Amino acid sequence: MFGIITLSSCIHLPPNNKHAEIHAIIDKANAEFYLDQRIWYQDVHAEINGQTILLTGEAFYSIPVKGIARKLKQAGFKFEFIDSVHYLPETFPDDLAYGIISEPYVMGRYKPVGHKQEGTEMLWGEPVRLIREKGDYLQVQSAIGYLGYIPKDALRRVKLEEWNRYHVGEQAIFTKNVTLENGLIILMGTRLPYLGNDLLLLADGNELQLSPDHYKLIDPANNPLRQEILNSAEQYLDLPYVWGGRSAEGVDCSGLVMQSYALNNIYLPRDSDEIANVGRMVGYPGWMEAMLPGDILFFAGSRRMITHTAIYMGEGKVIHSLGKGVQIQSINPDDPDYSSSLERS
């Protein structure tokens, strides 16, 4: 739940300043905060005016921006830092910050126009998050996390409450192409919310009764594998935190996640930032309604983009390996076992 931070092109320094050192710090920050620009946007710049560094550009979250300022301060640059970064997503009128794809399929492009800018297709009924408006296009984030520009008329704008109906709950995934009476073709691979009794929620908000011969049902919440992953993770409770550990003698955060999944025949990469590039995006800060027990959380820090990972247990609880070892804590500030260290991550 990522891209390169560019911070050097707008810096203008007097000759007596350590220009090369600043560029080296920025280059290092670029490498540390890099993840996958297909699902993350960050383009931050700096301008120097006397003893003030103005941070500008665009970003999803403030933590990496604060991290850059922190690195420069630690290097001895005693400037005043002003954060003027434009944070995404933009604010949309009437809280219509979400959308449902209303075309049989539409290509999401890395730029609104141009050759070889194709990212990934989005299918009819797919829920997307609106990121920004640019002329006749909207930049959106698809259900699998990809960013892409699509024409404005390729989706129906909705509020969060309606969007959740398409993102959360039992789904019907079409196993063949289906042509409706109105001529609309639902393509194989399309997912629509299943309301029960062969009733589907269509992309336009209407409902349709359709024989299950055309689709199969999937219900992520009732997958027994989720509880089995949690059971495996709980076998590590109270083990010490060991950097690089993945044995019964101790584990680090990604070692716990990796092994809990491996015990259930799911093999993940070793490190947290690698795991973050696997699977489907199911939540982001400020919206976690779709998260289910067994999902993986990632935490950002000011030193680099992904600094910690944990397994979600439901109701705000996570199991993770941190300083005191493997433990169950809460990410809800109102809970007695709330971990403020996770809030700072």
Model-derived features: where do they sit?
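Structural motif
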Residues: 126, 190, 294-295
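Aromatic- and glycine-rich peptidoglycan recognition patches
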Residues: 157, 216, 283-287, 307, ...
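Catalytic cysteine-centered active-site loop
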Residues: 241-255, 259-291
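SH3/SH3-like (including bacterial SH3b) beta-barrel domains
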Residues: 41-45, 112-124, 179-188
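Gly/Ser-centered flexible loop/linker motifs
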Residues: 16-50, 106
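Boundary regions of SH3-family modules and the immediately adjacent low-complexity/disordered segments
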Residues: 70-92, 113, 141-239
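Short glycine/threonine-rich beta-strand-turn micro-motifs
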Residues: 42-72, 137
